[in-house]
């Protein structure tokens, strides 16, 4: 049997060939001894002695230790990406009737091409951008996707057919999905779970504000001398300005990639090729990515009651938001006789409601309305605020529907947007947070399923609304949708009382 190896023997790994010091065990003479000695060397190499990780909690290379101001610069940059891409998702809705006249097509066809196809691209984008962010880090796919989104706005302004617009809008949604697919990962990279309670609602508010601002600004552009083509130019200019002002301050934050880079530097500095990171030990294949972003999300959505019902509820509320981008113009233009720009102003009330909800979420982060295992508050605690939103949403919708008559004062209908926006934002944010809490290490797969279905609902509701409001009007059309929102109210109540038991039986329940 070969003598045991010493530290001096391991030092030899720093050279191109293994060497032995004069005070170490002599090289093995027999084949058996040589094989035994090599096995010991390999075991030493495989040990954690050469595994590269963060050096203590204060390691400056760890994104969690970035300066506080730098974290907020990154967070607000992500918020601006979310704002501009979601703004683009709804802004062309203001040009629906103008485009229908210019291309001599039905309004439903224009809605399909300008809004719905963008959201279909937004739904399919995460299937690509999620794996891309794990293989190449956060910044590369974020920059590639956002710049692609900005560039694709330019040819829309010169498009001569609705077919061209449809293709460009779909691709714009696909590339524009990159920030939304990656931002939650970046926030998790730089903020602790407690700090994330403030950062996530901030970014989430911009995700809701963006599509609300779209019809407001779009209406102004359509009615101005600039015309509908400048909608795309404005989105492009704003996106390029955001990119130029934020990209220089956006570092790589993906821990596996940062540690792999550190391991590579150490290998070249020491000539010791045994240094490696955990991510280099477990290289992901195409099959792994397919499992994580296609197969597992589909299985979880089909087999997990919490994910299925919460995703359905969040998707309906998100679809209702896009429905209102058609309901408001239909009611205030066609029924009350307002001009397009003035008719878009009542949407501000939905924005106000969303901002109030965002402020409430930030305030409640460290209150009894937030989960806290040490104080005996389970994950289901956050569903209390979701219940508030569940009641607020249909209340606002009923008020909007039953005060829509042209003979009634418009202010009750205008102010109905406050409880509507308040409810939509609470349902979306608390539903997403509950999904993340429930599946933790499988949250990426759960969110991938949620994002896909949510975007499809946002694509489908405007098409439904166009036909429905034309057939039965705003009052009864919105009443039917409000009843759908009422039917969803039991979902957070059910999981508040039985969610813990359901999670305990889950195949994807993470270990404690």
UniProtKB/Swiss-Prot annotation:
Alphabetical keyword list: Cell membrane, Membrane, Transmembrane, Transmembrane helix, Transport, Virulence
Knockout mutant characteristics: Reduces cercosporin toxin accumulation and fungal virulence.
Any one annotated GO CC term: plasma membrane
Locations listed in the record: Cell membrane
Induction: Expression is positively regulated by the cercosporin cluster-specific transcription factor CTB8. Expression is also affected by nitrogen and carbon sources and pH, and is also controlled by another transcription activator, CRG1, previously shown to regulate cercosporin production and resistance.
MF term (GO), any: transmembrane transporter activity
Keyword Transferase assigned: no
Family under the similarity heading: Belongs to the major facilitator superfamily. CAR1 family.
Purpose: MFS transporter; part of the gene cluster that mediates the biosynthesis of cercosporin, a light-activated, non-host-selective toxin. The perylenequinone chromophore of cercosporin absorbs light energy to attain an electronically-activated triplet state and produces active oxygen species such as the hydroxyl radical, superoxide, hydrogen peroxide or singlet oxygen upon reaction with oxygen molecules. These reactive oxygen species cause damage to various cellular components including lipids, proteins and nucleic acids.
Protein name as annotated: Cercosporin MFS transporter CTB4
Origin species: Cercospora nicotianae (Barn spot disease fungus)
Gene that this sequence comes from: CTB4
